[in-house]
Amino acid sequence: MGADASLPMEMCSNFDAYELRRLTRRFKKLDVDGSGSLSVEEFMSLPELQQNPLVQRVIDIFDEDGNGEVDFREFIQGISQFSVKGDKNTKLKFAFRIYDMDRDGFISNGELFQVLKMMVGNNLKDSQLQQIVDKTILFHDKDGDGKISFQEFCDVVEHTEVHKKMVLENI
């Protein structure tokens, strides 16, 4: 990648030229088959994601074009959200998108159930998990439409400082 190729990436990410060069090398190392994009298996070799039960959701969000793989641009833009320079709103939007599986701008009862199921596995019975989901929606759905909007989500996590935990230190 020449200087021309990295300039737009600097403008649409939170990384400077040096960080982009490092990330380019890391991407190429992860791209074992040399295809120019990361498969789920290649992506899973990132130590930061190996123990994360939501790794498939992270990959789905990074994969903006929905082709099942993460190309370099998607990788940089995705990782950029976890930069220490990333802003709170961007991090909250990413966290919201983990739950908003169909990308309609809302977290439905079913979506919340699916994501929580990924996190708790079989530690709770489905009926117990459904009760938690129902109560969560009921309590935080301020406009009564049966789903959680981005603003309602932000109201819930506002005081948790979750955005400060959404940082990869050694990218």
UniProtKB/Swiss-Prot annotation:
Q: Name one Pfam family in it.
A: EF-hand_7
User: Which keywords fit this entry according to its UniProt record?
Assistant: Calcium, Cytoplasm, Endocytosis, Metal-binding, Repeat
Tell me which CDD domains the record gives: EFh
Q: Where is it mostly found?
A: cytoplasm
Per the UniProt record, the site (Interaction with PxVP motif in substrates of catalytic subunit) maps to 118, 122
Localization recorded for this chain is: Cytoplasm
- Coiled-coil parts of chain: none
Task: Describe its partners and assembly state.
Answer: Forms a complex composed of a calmodulin-dependent catalytic subunit tax-6 (also known as calcineurin A) and a regulatory Ca(2+)-binding subunit cnb-1 (also known as calcineurin B) which confers calcium sensitivity.
UniProt lists the family membership as follows: Belongs to the calcineurin regulatory subunit family.
What is this protein called in UniProt?
Protein phosphatase 2B regulatory subunit cnb-1
Q: What is the lineage of its organism?
A: Eukaryota, Metazoa, Ecdysozoa, Nematoda, Chromadorea
